Amino acid sequence: MSHFPKLLSSQIAFDVARTMLDGFDKHYRLFREVSHQAKLKFEAGDWHGLQQIQRDRIAFYNERVRESSVILEDEYDAENIEDEIWQQIKLHYIGLLTNHHQPELAETFFNSVCTRILHRSYFNNDFIFVRPAISTEYIENEESPTRPTFRAYYPGSREGMAACFERVVHNFQLESPFEDLQRDIGYVVRAVSEHFGDLRIAPNFQVHTLSSLFFRNKSAFIIGRILNGDRTFPLAIPIVHGPSGKLTLDTVLLKKEQLLILFSFTHSYFMVDMEIPSAYVTFLRDIMPRKPRAEIYTSLGLQKQGKNLFYRDFLHHLQHSSDKFIVAPGIRGLVMLVFTLPSYPYVFKVIKDFFPAPKETTRELVKSKYQLVKQHDRVGRMADTLEYSDVAFPLSRFDEALVREFEQHAPSMIEYQRGKDGGEEIVVRHVYIERRMTPLNIYLTEGTDEQVEHGVIEYGNAVKELIAANIFPGDMLYKNFGVTRHGRVVFYDYDEIEYLTDCNIRDVPQPRNEEEEMSGEVWYTVRPHDIFPETFRTFLLGDTRVRAAFLRHHADFFDPAMWQSHKDRLLAGHVHDFFAYHSSERFIHRYSEAGSAQGTAAVPDPGPARRVA
């Protein structure tokens, strides 16, 4: 730090630091309260209530940042505080975090408040946390030894596993009764034995489970790991309400790929109570070492921390790469200017200044659609986005064609400035960042017959799961869907999405005369929010291979009755079950006696468990 203050002499500096930390502590207290509510609502089967607190929680962070900023402006005239005092504020804040259990989150909160108060030209290393100041290693929950980050169990042998897993379940103290816990524990032990086969039990054989349940959609997940010798295996046990209304263990997941799907960027955030979030992230990284810490924080509902870490990783990549940002390959969009850095697996999307026909939208409406997706259950079929404002890029790293695209289609979204090193920078005023995927239209055009079959099956499943979750994609062209690196189809173009319950599902009227029948134009009245599933054939079935696969697997896609049935169930208050694993993994399907005991209610199938978004 330049001009490091030799003496922390300002009482105002300490008071401001204390006020900012109080704001964060209030935020995290409310954040944890949602997790407590999630347990109660899960036990009661209050699915609409769970959805509501999930939506509400997303707004908590910005509300507390605004609240803290107002207090600092009103009580300390924060915008006019001298630079020397800001340096002292940061140092006092570091001191206050010495024994804090969420220091990394509190540092990010400090940055958010600072950047709200100060102009971006003041965002320098002296005022904000560009790197962590407080270590998060080995933070222990000493205040509550009965709630460690994780619990360790020692089965002793294969024969002791049943008692071990029974203790695991009981320690979560769920108030709702289980339908038949002994039966389900038997299935868990059976599945574990089948998975490990003749694996020799080592002296250190043990099971670790995180102390809090992970709530999402209509499931609660036990997350843990199995240690044997020098090997570590992931463990996840979803708990659901069975057809009887009582709790059941739905399956056990023991593969890294299955955990990666569970924590995918295409799913909504978990609700989980964490006293020490960094310890949870460390545990999860142990069973998913390929998963970036930024994505793990985000999946835990700490999306601002994920966003902060992502940006640090991005700056690090820029520092150690030399390729240029280019216009993203593929069909140009009417609403978004999309660019990418070939060496980095993400795309950057900027809303254009104007939209040619037939698009009828506005910048604010597009932003509202992206916010809708952020707050909705993405059911593994919509990519999460990171939203940033005033991002400065080195101009020398922008391809000339990309600069021309900006100046032609989004001139209001950029400005030029000199960086601290004297180099020219291009500042993008607002940008969404998403994981880069292969556009489905390219995948279907260039793929083998087997890949086309797979892509069509996935596309149909994706749309059906979205409408079951009350999302109508709007523009369903293949170019608006992507294929992840492991073959899962995901929707990523949100400017035309609507709630299915707001749409009118209609049959195409019968032509009244020969002129209407032969007309190449739409001759019937189309109102806003009207959907005509029969017309989807026109733009989905043009390719011979695609058509054959589509009609084999998703012929009902063009039947208005299929769409209307989903809408009717949604209007009746039904909340669908969505599973982040293949239905064949569920005990009711895996073991015949489970199926006969519990029934086999039809649920949307997310596809083969090997696929990782």
Swiss-Prot record:
GO terms for molecular function: [isocitrate dehydrogenase (NADP+)] kinase activity; AMP binding; ATP binding; phosphoprotein phosphatase activity; protein serine/threonine kinase activity. One of its GO terms (cellular component) is cytoplasm. Its EC number is 2.7.11.5, 3.1.3.-. GO terms for biological process: glucose metabolic process; glyoxylate cycle; tricarboxylic acid cycle. It comes from the Bacteria. It is found in: Cytoplasm. Its main location: cytoplasm. It catalyses: L-seryl-[isocitrate dehydrogenase] + ATP = O-phospho-L-seryl-[isocitrate dehydrogenase] + ADP + H(+). The active site is at 384. InterPro entries: AceK_kinase (IPR046855), AceK_regulatory (IPR046854), Isocitrate_DH_AceK (IPR010452). Keywords: ATP-binding, Cytoplasm, Glyoxylate bypass, Hydrolase, Kinase, Nucleotide-binding, Protein phosphatase, Serine/threonine-protein kinase, Transferase, Tricarboxylic acid cycle. This is Isocitrate dehydrogenase kinase/phosphatase.
